[in-house]
Amino acid sequence: MLELVASLVVDLSDQRLTVYNSDQEVVRVIPVSTGKASTPTPIFNSKVYTKYRSTTMYGRTYTVPGVPFTMCVSANESICLHAAPWQENAGKPFGVPRSHGCVRMPLKHARWLFHNTPKGTPITIQA
């Protein structure tokens, strides 16, 4: 059964994404990797603006094609939630800041989140 996500909260201090349903019950807690100290994930309230089954991520020092299950939460698409299979393949655990500002997560969680989170879902990124 498809279970729609009602809200998302990313906690930068414990590197976790908590998923809530419409009754504000915790549906899932996902380990994530947010921005490193040199490229921090901003603290803000937003919503899911766009969703891409696969997209290319660009930065000043990188281009990563085929990033799966991406959901952008900033209007300019600079901050997104997405799978990071390269991190998994390298054996680097989630729960540690490693990104350029996005919220990375394991592929299985990103797939589930992508399929259960509608555009417009509110998200809070907090310290």
What are these regions (language model features)?
Residues 1-50, 70:
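Cell wall/extracellular polymer interaction/catalysis modules
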Residues 2-3, 39-45, 52-127:
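Exported/periplasmic cell-wall-interacting domains
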